[in-house]
């Protein structure tokens, strides 16, 4: 059966030459095989194991002070420059300035690929789709994808097979105690 966590990591979506995959996704089993002298062990239970790990938040040697559940002492990235560039690209595309949108999008892609060969020249809807695809890759496993899908109205088509219900899952339920205390109206569907 499908495991929801299997779809949170877009490992197969990265193009050849895209350097982001190596710093985003860690195939722990392949890493163990390639580095037998390290004698790597890791705990799976009680978590689901897809075989892939979020490389962005794995602690590095010497960074293992603090709580394991909080990713040790790793900083949580609230916003990144690439995110700002992609937001600008989307805004310029939506306001009809595709040239400016391409410029911001391609700044991100040039860093990712290290060349000019992967620039996007699409316009209109195709450019918009390219910007959204770039957000998926650039911000992979940083907690943005769900909100991008909801914001763009694509959540039901992408997440429907995982149980997403349009008109309900765009919002989280308000804890019942808060509803009772404050006399709030619960979000739809809960």
Model-derived features: positions:
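Flexible, polar/acidic helix-loop-strand segments at domain edges
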Residues: 9-81
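Extended, hydrophobic/aromatic-rich amphipathic alpha-helical segments that build helical scaffolds
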Residues: 18-21, 75-108, 128-140
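Hydrophobic residues in alpha-helical segments
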Residues: 14-15, 93, 150
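Long, intrinsically disordered, low-complexity segments
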Residues: 1-3, 71, 76, 109, ...
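Flexible loop/turn segments at secondary-structure boundaries
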Residues: 31-32, 99-100, 147-148, 156
């Amino acid at each position: 059966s499908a495991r929801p966590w299997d779809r949170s990591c877009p490992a197969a979506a990265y193009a050849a030459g895209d350097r982001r995959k190596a710093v985003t996704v860690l195939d722990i089993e392949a890493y163990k095989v390639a580095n037998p002298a390290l004698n790597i062990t890791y705990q799976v239970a009680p978590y689901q194991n897809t075989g892939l790990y979020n490389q962005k938040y794995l602690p590095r040697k010497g960074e293992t002070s603090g709580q394991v559940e909080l990713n040790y002492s790793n900083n949580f990235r609230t916003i990144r420059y690439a995110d700002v560039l992609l937001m600008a690209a989307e805004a310029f595309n939506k306001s009809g300035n595709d040239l400016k949108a391409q410029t911001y999008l391609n700044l991100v892609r040039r860093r990712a690929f290290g060349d000019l060969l992967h620039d996007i020249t699409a316009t209109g809807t195709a450019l918009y789709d390219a910007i959204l695809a770039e957000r998926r890759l650039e911000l992979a496993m940083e907690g943005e994808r769900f909100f991008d899908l909801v914001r763009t109205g694509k959540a039901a088509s992408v997440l429907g097979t995982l149980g997403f219900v349009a008109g309900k899952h765009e919002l989280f339920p308000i804890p019942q105690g808060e509803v009772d205390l404050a006399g709030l109206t619960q979000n739809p569907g809960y």
